[in-house]
Amino acid sequence: MALTWPSSPPVLLTLLLSLLALQLCAVYGSYEHTCTLATRSRGAHPSGICGRNLARIVSVLCTPRGYVSNWFTKRSAPNKPAETFVDQNLRGVLLNKREALSYLRPREPRATRGTFGSQGITCECCFNQCTYYELLQYCN
C-alpha cells in the first residue's frame, strides 16, 4: 500500500498549517532551554544566575507559595581529603570534578526521561539567561 499526498492545494495547505500549529504548541509546553555537555563545558552564561544567588532569588520570588527546596541542597561530602580515596597510580587517568559530574544524569521526571540533554533551573538560569517568568515556573 503506497502512501500518497493529497493532490488538492487546500488540503495540503491545511495539513501543513495543522502540523505547524502542533509544533508551536509543543514548544510552549516544555522547558525553554536544554543543556548538553557542550553547553555545560562553556560555563555559566555571562548574565546567568548560579549557585547561592539562584537559590536566594527563587526563595524570594516563591515566598508566598514556596518552592521545592531539594533542588538547591548540596549532598554531604566525606571530610577526608581526596588523596585518601584515590590511588596515586590513577591520578593521570581521572577526570576533574566538573568533567566527571557532566557525565552524571540528574533525576528527571518520567515524562522527560530519554530526551537529549538535561533541563532544569540550573540549565535555564545558570548556563543560559532566564526570565522572571521562567523563574516563577519553579514556584509551587
UniProtKB/Swiss-Prot annotation:
It is found in: Secreted. It comes from the Eukaryota. InterPro entries: Insulin-like, Insulin-like_sf, Insulin-rel_pep, Insulin_CS, Insulin_family. The keyword Lipid metabolism does not apply. Keywords: Carbohydrate metabolism, Cleavage on pair of basic residues, Disulfide bond, Gamma-carboxyglutamic acid, Glucose metabolism, Hormone, Secreted, Signal, Toxin. One of its GO terms (molecular function) is hormone activity. Residues 1-29 form the signal peptide. Residues 64-110 form a propeptide. One of its GO terms (biological process) is glucose metabolic process. GO terms for cellular component: extracellular region. Its main location: secreted. SMART domains: IlGF. The modification 4-carboxyglutamate is found at E134. PROSITE patterns: INSULIN. SUPFAM superfamilies: Insulin-like (SSF56994). Pfam families: Insulin. Disulfide bonds join C35-C123, C50-C126, C62-C139, C125-C130. Expressed by the venom gland. Belongs to the insulin family. This venom insulin facilitates prey capture by rapidly inducing hypoglycemic shock. Intraperitoneal injection of this peptide into zebrafish lowers blood glucose with the same potency than human insulin. In vivo, when applied to water, this peptide reduces overall locomotor activity of zebrafish larvae, observed as a significant decrease in the percentage of time spent swimming and movement frequency. Heterodimer of A and B chains; disulfide-linked. This is Con-Ins Im2. It comes from Conus imperialis (Imperial cone).
